[in-house]
């Protein structure tokens, strides 16, 4: 079966790791403008080893301790320093995480207050536009009905004015109900 990828085929022919690296470097030098992939090592915070349950090489007396025991002291000191550094790094990381969390919460509260203000303004403008539209509609109907009433006899004008007032009240009730429905839907979203 023929293999499609010539690069992997070439890398399989490498006799050793140095040959493989040499081939890859040669390939990179052929196309020098292309950026080389450089893996970035992530700095992970690893906990130090747990202390041993039973320590075998305990130095009994400082009077008898000579230069032979110094390497034991040095290793113990290094382990303790690593442990303290780890504790400090964890504390610093937690502090930074808390600061970030508080900053995010503060920004969310500010954004929420801004959107609430804009939502209220938008609803006020919407309600005002509906009122204007309703009053304009009522004014047009009043004008057309006044023209009709002028041509008709004056006996039915009282009943017509009462009917107009009733329709205006009903229209206002409808508008208020629609506004409350709109507010409820916007609050729920």
Swiss-Prot record:
Transmembrane segments: none annotated. Residues 105-115, 161-177 have a biased composition (Basic and acidic residues). Coiled coil: none annotated. GO terms for molecular function: double-stranded RNA binding; protein kinase binding; protein kinase inhibitor activity. Residues 141-151, 178-189 have a biased composition (Acidic residues). Residues 116-136 have a biased composition (Basic residues). InterPro entries: Prkrip1. GO terms for cellular component: nucleolus. Residues 105-189 are annotated as: Disordered. This is Uncharacterized protein F37A4.2.
